[in-house]
Structure formats: C-alpha cells, structure tokens
Amino acid sequence: DVCSSDLGQPRWCPGCGDHFFLNSLHKALAEIGVKPWETAVISGIGCSSRLPYYMNTYAMQTIHGRAAAISTGCKVTNPNLSVWQVSGDGDGLAIGGNHFIHAIRRNIDINILLLNNRIYGLTKGQYSPTSPRGFVSKSSPYGTVEDPFHPAELCFGARGRFFARCVATDGPGTGEVLKAAANHKGAAVCEILQHCVIFNDGTYDSVYNKDGRAKNAIYLEHGKPMLFGENKEFGLMQEGFGLKVVKLGERSEEHT
C-alpha cells in the first residue's frame, strides 16, 4: 500500500492545499495499482517537498531545485520504476527551472507534479516566478515589477507532449489528471493550483470551491465541447489571437 498509518501526520499548516493533494495522490496510485517497491517519489525543497515523507514507496527529498535531475537519474537507471517528481513553483521554476525544461525536452518518462501556490511558503512569504505582476509580498513590498511564468507555456515551449492543470480541492478531477499522467509514456507535467493559507490565501478563489469551479472552470474531455457555467450555458470562441466567452443560444452578428 502506498499509504501507511506508520508514516505519521503531515507537518503542513491546517487547510494547506498539500493535504488535499496528498489524499488525491494516495487514492490515484492505489487505483492505478502501482506497487510501492516499483515507485519512487522525489522532491526538492519547500513545503510541498515534504510529501515524500508520507509515501510508503521509495522516496527522497533532494537539494533545492534538483528534483527533476534526480528523477531523471532514477528513471534512466531503472526504467521499470514509476517516478513521481514533486516541486513547488519556487523549487520547480526558479532554482529548478533549467532542470524543469530539459526534463521535458528530453521527454523522460517521469511525472512532474508542480504544486503552484504563487508564493514561497517555507521561507515565509517571498514572491515566486508565478506570482502575478504587482503582487505585494515580503520581498516585493511595493509590488512585483515582473510578469509571471505560465507553466503550460513553459511546458509547450520545451516541446512537452503532456500538460494538465487541476485544483487541489477537486479530488475527483485531480485523480483523473494523475491517472492520465501515469498512463502517458514520456514526461507528464501536472500543475496543481492550491492556496498557501498563511502567506497567499485566496489566490485561486475563483476555482477553489465547487461553486466557483462550476462558474469559472472548464473540464477538458476528449471529443466533448468546451462548455462551462452552472448549467453549461457558456462556451469559448476564438477572437483574434485570443478567446472570448459566449453564451450559448445568443446570436452573434459577427459570426452569422
């Protein structure tokens, strides 16, 4: 069993998104049927990087930013291992950004789990590479002057073949993403949106609860229309180089 009561209680703040994600990962791996002795969970440094301590598998917490490099080595050394890399947005995209893009470019068969809360939590609240422009933090008291990384763009820019995004509080959706990543042969990047309840609470309020997701999130399913809203009454339409929201059934003079 990948989950064991002997592993102790996670040392995360109450309400941290890491709790939700850990439960989803335990459940997904159990449903996939992976064997603990054929699974390795590798992390860097950060709050989310404590996750390997709560896995009844081969597990290793490495040095800051090097989880992708160690994960690559594990997979190349033993191709039969199911390798799961866990990194936060700071660990994975700042000090570990170089390893992140090259693991994707090489298309190594590892699962890269990027837990994105748009903040450095372990070091007490500095802005990260995914913090939005103008974000006020301990290291940017007047607001950041930088534009953030979008992990999906980085992944596709590095010629990635698999990218998925989910919300930590959406257990079923997260589970489906993790199982799809496990079944993909090659580098699979999963971005998990979550709150840091101490230093960046509310950053994903628009999709963090069930009602918010019904209004603002699109569940992409192969062969099905991209609809959202409480009654699936909204869709997306291309407009120039971007997208715009349209309400189904309303006549658009531009497209008649």
Per-region residue spans from a language model:
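Short, hinge-like loop/turn segments at secondary-structure boundaries
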Residues: Y58-A59, A103, S128-P132, A181, ...
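Short coil/turn connectors at secondary-structure junctions
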Residues: G8, K35-T39, T77-V83, R105-N111, ...
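Thiamine diphosphate
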Residues: I45-G121, G175
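Flexible, low-complexity linker and terminal segments
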Residues: L7-G8, I198-E254
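ATP/pyrophosphate-binding catalytic subdomain of soluble kinases
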Residues: R161-Y219
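Conserved thiamine diphosphate
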Residues: S128-N183
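Short, small-residue-biased leader/transition segments that mark boundaries at the very start
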Residues: V2-S4
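Active-site diphosphate/adenylate-binding microenvironment
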Residues: D6-I63
